[in-house]
């Protein structure tokens, strides 16, 4: 017998696919209908050794359908999502439900753009506002409301937003919080073309964002009294700010091959659960400088964030739920399997760090460069928590709650190293064009306690090799080998993956991640994976079978936990 959950999942997926076919065959007058469909499902098999727990419904899946109608300057769209029986990692973060949770209507001309419904938006680098979607992470914090964009003169851009932030599949009705804001940017190269013609870049911008959340309860906390012991402290509801504003100013300047970006943001007092309900204002600074010329490039970045976690609701602390802003991660992002679980997660309440990357190409037709040159990339990044000195009232009470919390020297690094990465990558294409080899080395230091809640530090050496061979113009073979040596956490691992592709339609791969150095002999496990994919026009169908170890998934410094799993997966994506 097929379970009710499987029947519903199959029915929903079939209806969504049918909708794709139906809409893909029609055009209404001068308008055009387009969209895309995605399904990601899995049949789960329990495995006690890797920690893959039995689940009530073994067949699970995530499905969505986007429909967009456009006609001249007008467009309207909606997205239906079916996550009633989602993949277990989505269920664990509360991303479960179904319905049309994204819909909008938009009109745009050269002067104005107006949107009603759901929309995504970002001001500057996102220090004050970033409403975005990342389906892989289960993040969708779109705003439901209205947005206006104005371009009164070329190079002058003004935006204003008002809306309620999406909270997974929870209803909007009854919410007592909303977000509003405005942003202005002036691009002097567009306003005065002579600036751009001379090779200069000059842009400045500023914004303000404010959240409102009704304060309806007192906040209780413990105070340590020398004579009375532990007593209860109270923050009256009328002392809890209902309106919390942030503002930011940014600038970009450049000349030919040099560019400098800077943005500073400040948040008013925002007592909430993630900062232990302190009244200290927050602030963040982002700096980036780049220089590039033929065969050489250098990029340096700096970030400092102090008490800058900014959410629609003060009691929310789950993953990235109801986050209004996003502090960008400036460290280099990697796709290596073995250090994926040690990716750095940006810390909006306490981080200071820097990143340096140098790219150099050994000249073509030289002894070391060969016919096509050899690319070398060096990378170094280091992040600490910030310096914190408790204010006298916090010391006296034995808690920062209800006080200004702490003071902090702006450019002083805190005592705790969060993350450090030293990396070197060499890429070379051989003279016959058929062979390409990438060799990489990284030394990672990762604070398990602060970043993942596990005890200790992880210090590890990673060596990775990626060798590609073009068998024929359409057939290619790729071998990826990795070795992570560490005495910390789960110990050393090796990874091997062989991929064969027949362009442009077929892809096959087999891989194995062996945690041979695990201190527990039972968990010296092989995490194997076999997959194949077929691509036809805009449609991709993929099958995979294997094991996934428990860890984290990170995209751009935003992370979520990934539970261990074992089973057969199916993925379908298409657009029309």
Where are the regions a protein language model picked out?
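Exposed, low-structure sequence patches enriched in small/polar residues
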Residues: 38, 53-56, 194-199, 206-208, ...
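Short alpha-helical segments and helix-capping/turn motifs at coil-helix boundaries
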Residues: 60-64, 98-103, 141-145, 180, ...
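Bacterial Sec-dependent N-terminal signal peptides
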Residues: 1-34, 575-576
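Long, low-hydrophobicity, solvent-exposed regions enriched in small/turn-prone and acidic residues
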Residues: 55-70, 77
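Short loop/turn motifs that connect adjacent beta-strands in outer-membrane beta-barrel proteins
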Residues: 25-33, 69-76, 106-111, 115, ...
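Short glycine/proline- and aromatic-enriched beta-strand/turn motifs that initiate or cap beta-hairpins
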Residues: 26-53, 383
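Hydrophobic, small-residue-rich alpha-helical packing segments that form membrane-like cores
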Residues: 139-238, 242-247, 252
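Outer membrane beta-barrel
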Residues: 68-70, 74-165, 194-196, 294-315
